[in-house]
Regions:
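Alpha-helical transmembrane segments of multi-pass integral membrane proteins
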Residues: 79, 746-763
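Conserved cytosolic headpiece of P-type ATPases
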Residues: 1-731, 736-739, 752, 796, ...
Length: 886
């Protein structure tokens, strides 16, 4: 339906409606046919499906397979399935954590969506009534006035100075004047921003009043179409998700390969030695299972989830609701932030910033009286420009209500787009005072005098030229400029037409206004630049306005280029790729342009964030690697698709999110390096022992170390504060693997270091337990059960403590441990892990379950000394690395 091409009468006829609206019976029938006037939300996964999705990680699957094998063996041997219970517990806890965090975020977003208005004023059977907005149907006649939010897409039937702010849909910050006149038919479909006789769901009436007939509701509205596209769009994996998935696959393949290799080696050796028995094969298989348990960092998934959750909690305290855990990390590697202007970088509130002419009190008295904006409680209501004028007068001590009591309005000529002026008449002790405000070039043509030193003097051509020059200078600064003039009468004039009143005026002055930038946004953009992040402004506003605001913010250089939507439409993808490489400001853009810009950055390999509050931002927010919505002024559609919602609509929160994202990713890498070097040490320890023909650790020992000893320090590393240079370095390359920057090498040699001290501890235990002196070769083949248990106990305790002490090394990959501040969480984790590891050795029931023996003071001291050795060795290597990189 091209309702904007038809007359108001035809639109009503096509909708089978009338100027007095529908009857209640008609409305009920249409509601049953069309459904409620609400946007459909994307159906989320069920709780069970969410839980199962948490188990799809390859490492989790290998763990579940190991648990299944262990369960079968426990049944065969009639043993208590301790290994199985531990594995299943950690898998379940990790899955529950993920589901709980997602559910909390969804509830936060649902709460934000309750901020929308719920009722509308309509005509039903010719009578005005208030109905729930969700019950509106096509054909309903809606009554609109200043302060209302448009409840559905409507065709204007009557406009009395009706102006609507549509920035949520079009990105245009200035209110648009609406009329009932049909638009000419040139055969081309018009975009919403060009339809002056249509109003759209989600827009706000800022001035005047009118009537409109509903032409579309719910998902059939412009907002609904965008919501549908977003609900059906897929979700891209974040950089962290991709890296962890890749790491899981690599570890899983390595585990399977190592297990198969060890199993084949042992079976082959048994066959060569004289035969393979079932018990021998079973024993070999258990060694392979031990390796699987050792190689997989069971706590990794839970640690990553919890570290991300900690980041989410910290962000929520700083007014950011994270909808997806991994969004925190994605912000940390963001290279480009594409931001809408209105309401995001600016305050979405017109403010007077310049005045010229008569004294401010005299000028703003005229502007305030010649305005329809007014104070309602503690806020101003009305068209944004007039609100700015009335507020500026109030700031000068000139409250409009007091002015109107002193100079009551006795006549007016409302603003219209043809005259570009508004005139009001006010009674004064001397008679009647007229105030006129409007476009400077138009008002100035009606002026014959100017007010100087308390009296009217003729307006010379030279003075007129100087006033117009000042107008141009103000316009060049992206100010919206209005001119004020006056005229005095001894009594109320009988002829009150525009032609009679708006001539022979006396010029008072110019007032310049703009939607000011957020002060914190300037600092935030400077911080982004320091962090190597490129800020880009994408707006529906005029080119000159966008350029001026961008320069104030520091986004655009003095000679920088601004690209318009019209220019962008003429470009193919290759030309656009070149343009986004050099342009940081895009003006007069449509929603599809925003998506193309984001896609162009993607083709260049840039991790891109998109911030915004309007429906027009939503498709690009969906397309970006991370979408940032505004909680206070943002539309429901935008909040639904955003990865993160700023509850204070403060752009500066983005910088905090970037910093938090970088800190979280750094800490996740520290935790991963710690866990992998620890698990590598376990694998190498078992591998060496297997090759030499003895057993050093059982699967239950490894599970205890991985889940009890290692998890607490890994979590404490996730609480580490950001390093000093965190916001002075460039974003990391999203293509970098999890082991980038030499981390893979560090994992390898640190794993070897812990392996060495663990094996030394085992053989030290044998030596301490043997009643006679033995050489090292004999120790490998020792058969004394007590000596073996002592060696195994010392190996377990040394491995546990070495990993705990090694966690202190992981606080920074390059900085010395002794140059850093304190991490109380890590000290707490060390004490807790030390206590738990010691308890296992000395509580008889636990020691028996783990097949341990209590260690003597000497054995305990040797184990601690060997474990502590990892700190000076790593410190020495760090010192060498710092010297090399210096």
């Amino acid at each position: 339906m091209q309702a904007y091409r038809w007359t108001a009468e035809r639109v009503l006829r096509e909708l089978n409606s009338a100027p007095g609206g529908l009857s209640h019976k008609q409305a009920a029938a249409r509601l049953a046919k069309h459904g409620e006037n609400r946007l459909a939300r994307k159906k989320g996964d069920s709780l069970w499906r969410r839980f199962m999705l948490q188990l799809s990680d390859p490492m989790i699957l290998v763990l579940l397979a190991a648990a299944a094998v262990s369960a079968v063996l426990c049944v065969v041997h009639r043993e208590f399935p301790a290994d199985v219970l531990i594995i299943m517990t950690v898998v379940t806890v990790n899955a529950v954590l993920g589901v709980v965090q997602e559910s909390k975020a969804e509830k936060a977003i649902a709460a934000l969506q309750e901020m929308t208005p719920a009722t509308s004023r309509v005509l039903r059977g010719g009578a005005e009534c208030t109905v729930p907005s969700r019950t509106l149907v096509p054909g309903d006649v809606v009554l609109l006035s200043a302060g209302d939010r448009i409840p559905a897409d409507c065709r204007v039937l009557e406009s009395i100075g009706l102006r609507v702010e549509e920035s949520a849909l079009t990105g245009e910050s200035q209110p648009v004047e609406k009329s009932a006149a049909p638009l000419p038919d040139d055969g081309q479909a018009l975009p919403p921003s060009a339809c002056s006789n249509l109003v759209f769901m989600g827009a706000n009436v800022v001035y005047g009043r009118g009537r409109a007939v509903v032409i579309a509701t719910g998902m059939d509205t412009q907002m609904g179409r965008i919501a549908h596209a977003l609900n059906t769009a897929g979700q891209n994996a974040t950089p962290l998700q991709k890296k962890l998935t890749q790491l899981s696959k690599i570890l899983s393949l390595l585990v399977l390969a190592i297990c198969a290799g060890i199993f084949a080696l042992d079976v082959g050796r048994s066959l060569l030695a004289g035969g393979l028995t079932f018990s021998g094969a079973l024993s070999t298989f258990m060694v392979a299972v031990s390796l699987a348990v050792a190689a997989i960092p069971e706590g990794l998934a839970a640690v990553v989830t919890i570290v991300l959750s900690i980041g989410v909690t910290k962000m929520s305290r700083r007014h950011a609701v994270i909808r997806r855990l991994t969004a925190v990390e994605t912000l940390g590697c963001t290279q480009v932030i594409c931001s809408d202007k209105t309401g995001t970088l600016t305050q979405n509130k017109m403010t007077v910033t310049a005045r010229t002419g008569v004294p401010p009190e005299q000028l703003m008295t005229a502007m305030a009286l010649c305005s329809d904006a007014h104070r309602a409680g503690d806020r101003m209501e009305g068209e944004p420009t007039e609100v700015a004028l009335v507020q500026d007068a109030a700031d000068l001590g000139l409250e409009k209500a007091a002015l109107e009591r002193q100079y009551p309005r006795v006549g007016e000529l409302p603003f219209d787009s043809a005259r570009k002026m508004m005139t009001t008449l006010h009674r004064t002790p001397e008679g009647v005072m007229q105030y006129t405000k409007g476009a400077p070039d138009v008002v100035l043509k009606r002026c014959t005098h100017t007010w100087q030193q308390g009296r009217a003097v003729p307006l010379t051509e030279d003075l007129r030229r100087r006033i117009l020059d000042e107008n141009r200078r103000m316009a060049d600064r992206a100010l919206r400029v209005l001119c004020a003039a006056t005229r005095q009468y001894p009594s109320l004039p009988s002829a009150r037409s525009p032609e009679a009143l708006e001539q022979g005026l006396c010029y008072l002055g110019l007032v310049g206004m703009m939607d000011p930038v957020r002060p914190e946004a300037v600092e935030a953009i400077a911080a982004c630049r320091q962090a190597g992040i490129r800020p880009v402004m994408i707006t529906g506003d005029h080119r000159d306005t966008a350029a001026a605001i961008a320069r104030q913010l520091g986004i655009l250089e003095p000679e920088g280029e601004v690209l318009t939507g019209a220019q962008l439409s003429q470009m193919d993808d290759r030309a656009l790729d070149d343009a986004v490489a050099r342009c940081s400001v895009f003006a007069r853009v449509q929603p599809n342009h925003k998506v193309r810009i984001v896609e162009a950055f993607h083709r260049q390999g840039a991790v891109t964030a998109m911030t915004g509050d309007g429906v027009n931002d939503a498709p690009a927010i969906q397309a970006a690697d991370i979408g940032v919505g505004m909680g206070m002024t943002g539309t429901d559609v935008t909040k639904n698709v955003a990865d993160m919602v700023l509850t204070d609509d403060n752009f500066a929160t983005i910088v905090a999110a970037v910093e938090e994202g970088r800190r979280v990713y750094d800490n996740i890498r520290k935790s991963i390096q710690f866990l992998l070097s620890s698990n590598l040490a376990e694998v190498l320890t078992i591998l060496v022992a297997t090759l030499l023909g003895f057993t050093i650790l059982e699967p239950v020992h490894l599970l205890w170390i991985n889940l009890i000893t290692d998890c607490f320090p890994a979590l404490a590393l996730g609480m580490e504060q950001g390093e000093p240079e965190i916001m002075r370095r460039r974003p990391r390359d999203p293509k970098d693997g999890i082991f980038a920057g030499g981390m893979g090498f560090d994992v390898a040699w640190q794993g070897l270091l812990v392996t060495a001290v663990t094996l030394l501890a085992y053989f030290s235990g044998l030596l301490l337990a043997c009643p006679v002196q033995m050489d090292w070769a004999a120790l490998v083949h020792i058969t004394d059960p007590l000596a073996h248990k002592t060696g195994m106990t010392m190996a377990f305790f040394t491995l546990s403590m070495a990993e705990i002490y090694h966690s202190f090394n992981m606080r920074s990959r390059r900085a010395s441990l002794f140059s850093m501040g304190q991490n109380g969480y890590l000290w707490g984790a060390m004490v807790l892990s030390l206590v738990l590891s010691t308890v296992v050795l000395y509580v008889p029931a636990l020691a028996a379950a783990f097949d341990f023996v209590p260690l003597s003071g000497t054995a305990y001291g040797v184990s601690m000394a060997l474990a502590l050795a990892v700190i000076p060795v790593v410190e020495l290597v760090k010192a060498v690395q710092r010297a090399v990189h210096r």
